[in-house]
Design a protein with these regions (language model features):
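Substrate-binding rim/cap in mid-to-C-terminal beta-strand-loop elements of soluble/periplasmic
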Residues: 55-89, 158-204
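Terminal low-complexity/disordered tails
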Residues: 201, 206-210, 221-222
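Residue-level signal for beta-strand positions within conserved beta-sheet cores that form or flank
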Residues: 25, 172, 213
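A glycine-biased structural micro-motif
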Residues: 186, 211-215
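Secreted, luminal/periplasmic, and some membrane-associated catalytic domains
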Residues: 13-158
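Active-site-proximal segments of metal-dependent phosphoesterases and phosphodiesterases across multiple
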Residues: 1-11
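Cytosolic regulatory/linker segments at or just downstream of nucleotide-handling modules
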Residues: 215-221
Length: 222
C-alpha cells in the first residue's frame, strides 16, 4: 500500500545518504515501531454510566460539579481516575461497578486492571487507578452526556476507523529489523517486549542502561 511504499522510499534515501558519505559499514540501521492498529466499529462513553450511577455529578446544564471517578478514553483502552484514591469505600464501589460493567458485555471492555496489575503486566504507570481494555472492536471517549455507544464516525479523529492503545496480544505485531556492525546476520528471534528495545540499541552503541525495565536482546547482537 501507499504507506509501505513511502516508508520503503524514505528508508532507502536514508541508507543511500549514509552510503554517500562512506559510513555505511560503521552504521547500524534499525527499523521498528511501537504498535500497530486494529479496526474499530464503535465508540463507547463509559462516563455516561458512571454519571448514571452517581460517580459523576452535574448541574442542569450538564457541567460537572463534582466527581468520584472519571474515565479518560485513550484509544482502545481507557484510564479511570479517582478524585480521592485514599477513600477506600469509594475505591471499592468504583471497582465493583467497573467489573459489573465489564461482565455485562455492554460497554466495550473485557478487562479491568488496577494500577498495580497493569504496571506488573505491561510496565504502564501513571496517576490513574484502573485501566479498561477494549473488547477488540471498541474505542473509548470521555463524554459524560448522550449515548453510551456510538457508531464509528470518521469525521471526528478521536473515533476513527482504527485505533491503538490495546494490549500487545491484539492486532498486527510490529517487527524489529536491525542490521549493521553491531548485529548478527540472518538471526530471527521470537517476540520480545518493547521495553527490551532501548537496552538493545544502547548496548549496540556501547552504553549500559542499568536502570532500564527491559534487557538487551543478546541473541541478535555481536
Amino acid at each position: 500500500n501507499d504507506m509501505l511504499d513511502h516508508t520503503a522510499l524514505w528508508t532507502q534515501r536514508i541508507i543511500e545518504a549514509v552510503e554517500e558519505i562512506g559510513e555505511a559499514e560503521n552504521t547500524n540501521f534499525i527499523i521498528t515501531s511501537d504498535h500497530g492498529q486494529i479496526d474499530v466499529s464503535r465508540w463507547a462513553m463509559p462516563n455516561v454510566e458512571l454519571r448514571r450511577r452517581g460517580f459523576i455529578r452535574t448541574d442542569a446544564n450538564d457541567v460537572i460539579t463534582d466527581y468520584d471517578a472519571f474515565i479518560k478514553g485513550v484509544g482502545c483502552c481507557a484510564l479511570v481516575y479517582l478524585k480521592d484514591e485514599s477513600d477506600k469505600k469509594t475505591y471499592k464501589a468504583v471497582y465493583d461497578a467497573l467489573k459489573e460493567m465489564r461482565d455485562s458485555g455492554l460497554y466495550g471492555f473485557t478487562e479491568v486492571f488496577t494500577r498495580e496489575e497493569i504496571a506488573a503486566k505491561e510496565h504502564l504507570s501513571g496517576p490513574f487507578s484502573f485501566v479498561l481494555e477494549t473488547d477488540g472492536y471498541t474505542s473509548f471517549g470521555s463524554e459524560w452526556t448522550g449515548s453510551i455507544i456510538h457508531q464509528r464516525d470518521i469525521t471526528d479523529y478521536r473515533g476513527g476507523a482504527a485505533s491503538h492503545g490495546y494490549l500487545p496480544d491484539k492486532g498486527a505485531q510490529p517487527t524489529l529489523i536491525a542490521c549493521g556492525p553491531s548485529f548478527k546476520k540472518g538471526v530471527t528471534v521470537d517476540r520480545r517486549p518493547i521495553v527490551d528495545l532501548a537496552p538493545t540499541i544502547a548496548k549496540a552503541m556501547g552504553v549500559d542502561l542499568a536502570d532500564a525495565n527491559g534487557k538487551p536482546i543478546d541473541e541478535i547482537l555481536l
